Amino acid sequence: MTDSMQQMALDTLGAYFGYTSFRPGQDRMVDAILAGRDALGVMPTGAGKSICYQVPALMLPGITFVVSPLLSLMEDQTRALLAAGARPSYLNSSLTPAQQNTVLKRAREGRYQLMYVAPERLLEPRFLAFAQEAAADGGIGVPLVAIDEAHCVSQWGQDFRPAYLQIREFIESLPQRPIVAAFTATATERVRADIQQMLGLQNPATVVTGFDRKNLYFGCEEMGDKAKAAWVRDYVIAHSGESGIVYCSTRKTVDALAGELAEALGPSGIRVGRYHAGMGNDARRQTQRAFIDDDIQVMVATNAFGMGIDKPNVRYVIHNNVPESIEAYYQEAGRAGRDGDPASCHLLWNGNDFRMRRFLIDRGDAADEALDDEQRAWALQNRYRLLSQMEGYCNTTGCLREYMLRYFGDEAAAEHAVAAAAGGTADDAEGCGNCSNCLTQFEVEDVTDMARVAVRYVATRPMRFGKSLIADVLHGGNTERIRQMHLDQDRGYGELSSESVGRIKDIIGQLCGRGYLATSQGQYPVVGLGPRAAEVEDEAFAFTVKRRASKRKASARARRAVDLLREEAELDQRPRVGDDAELFERLRALRKEISTELEMAPYMVFSDKALRGLCRLRPQTRDELIQVNGIGEKKADAFGEQFMSAIEEFESEHARDGA
């Protein structure tokens, strides 16, 4: 791409979005698209994927189609682009037939630069006819088709949607093939290859910016259901001034936890919302809008909430239950800290979570109805594989960040996350320093004898049992089930009587995770021998585990790590003295007033970072105003006078007070 084209891209970025430079990876994606090349961008949530197709769409003649899976994303992106001075549109089922006709009519007239559409609509006859007309000679032109959440096309991913398989057919039906750009935040190498093949990308420029979100703290704690509810309540109270999301695996849990939190937090003024697929469309839309508009501080939701929610100031995401995969967890947790400021991601789990997940897997998914028997069986097996990786995350005593980075194939970042101090080795490394495992003191314990006992017992049993029953037998339990099945006669019964059932069960889990034992699929998995079972009989066999030395000390260190990150951010970004803090709150109030009047989210007017920039620079002219990062020419023209007047009034008041 020519230097002049690159400068035009930077000018477009500044005019519409208020930035003077692209983030890492954005420039390469924009360059590839403007050079006429297909592109695949794998960029973490908050890295600015939308900029990669919005900037070219604002530069290229014609209309860019953006394929998006959710109505909320279409509507929010359209509002944000309108606020920035662009000409976007969307076409989905929330519009009446008359409104859809109007949108298509205006599109034919060349009034729009972008159009957001759902994958299900692409082959709908009326839309397809419009798209083919636009892409034909003499039409308005279709220079680019951008595909968001592209991992949905892959059956290897955690969120396969059959409608995404229509995208390639749609593109191939156009008279002139457009540039095709696909974007995702979560994709292993296998999923990336699937995306390229299923979408028909031609020699794409592939940009993988890495998966490490350094501003996020990751915590993982095992606890009972009652302890979870108390933990969430206490955490939300301690962070009452912040926006957060609490994810639950079922609608029932969402309703129960949201009700409990609302009752407990109501007196403190913290508003709690709930969101799941069992609610009506209007109720979900209203709740989502209230959260985006900062009228609700805490959203308790199933995974039906969040995809496409572009709310930058979410300070924490708590998973009250285990998600179905590492991909799902990374994507949902990644909704925290999109503004780049420190944020926290906490996973609370117990064995019941995995039993529920296995039940949900066996029950099947609505998307499975479009699959044949062979595909359905494969999908079931794949979901169990993904859940197994999630179980490994919960049980690891290593760095949580490293576990996820290695899962996604980001080896360089994983090595960096656990890099040793100068002069040390990898074994000496203290890890990333920003996850609960790295901030926990562990003791290494040799449990070779226990491991041998467990594997040998499983090897002698012709009938397979679950972890709990095996642990009971090895402990020497006197339960009715053990007596009825005569398991108290087994060789190995009571051989680990000095250990607790929970301890034995944990060792069995570790043996499964390392391949000495293995669990079957299904809601009630049983334990069998793993591929490495024979190794336990080797004289050199050794099996060690790590045990937490002090949970209390670990929790204190974890809190301190997040506090340090936030203190660093405050030094650079937040109002530092009393009058700056007062001005910040006044500008927030003005932003809320403007956004309410214009029916848009507050961050679509100016972001929190932009408000902090206004507090520091206190601009008095338009030229000074557009020096604030995140305030472009379009927004300066739309909102600048009101904010500069508020700053001038504030300074006048303080000048009088100081006189």
Segment roles from a protein language model:
Residues 33, 236, 291, 394, ...:
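Short helix-to-turn junction characteristic of helix-turn-helix DNA-binding domains
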Residues 176, 240, 397, 463, ...:
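Flexible coil/turn residues that form the inter-helical turn or adjacent wing/linker of helix-turn-helix
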Residues 348-351, 363, 393-396, 406-411, ...:
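Short acidic/histidine-centered micro-motifs embedded in hydrophobic/aromatic stretches
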